[in-house]
Amino acid sequence: MFSEKILLKLYKAWNHRLNMYHILKYKDYEPKIDESAFIAGGSRIVGKVEIGKNASIWFNCVIRGDVGSIRIGDETNIQDGTVIHVDRNPGGDTIIGNMVTVGHFCMLHACTVHDKAFVGMGSTVMDHAVVESEAMVAAGSLVTHGKVIKSGEVWAGRPAKFLKKMSDEEIKYITQSAQNYVMLMREYEN
């Protein structure tokens, strides 16, 4: 009889093969995905992309590192329907730190989101914008070119503007959200 660990390894290898067509090389660049990361069906990951430990990419995301690079940190979750892209001009990479939550149907383009930040559902973060650690972009917001959302701030609106300082409870929620998605991806793997 096969042990449970062997069966899990076989399943992961089989599932990885099923998802291979979702992971595409662009020129000489092939995505580097940590073996502990979770990639849900329907997602497309292209080119110069690096995905960290225990990160999760949920259903129908597009992460396209063709004319620049994308880095997604450890324990970060990119939720369903999100699009992440880059710009070919200097500074056009997209960097997403560790323990970040990016909500459903977001668009991140050539921007930086630091560790333990939160981008709410349906938000857009444009070129050269920065979301600092422990900062929050409210759902449905548009963070325009070059804006910097400082640590401990919530920004909201289209275009996004400073809304308020975050409470300690809201800051804790960011970490909890990242941890919840690590647990959720484990449930999907089992």
Language model region names:
Residues 1-36, 146-190:
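Terminal amphipathic alpha-helical/low-complexity segments used for targeting or macromolecular assembly
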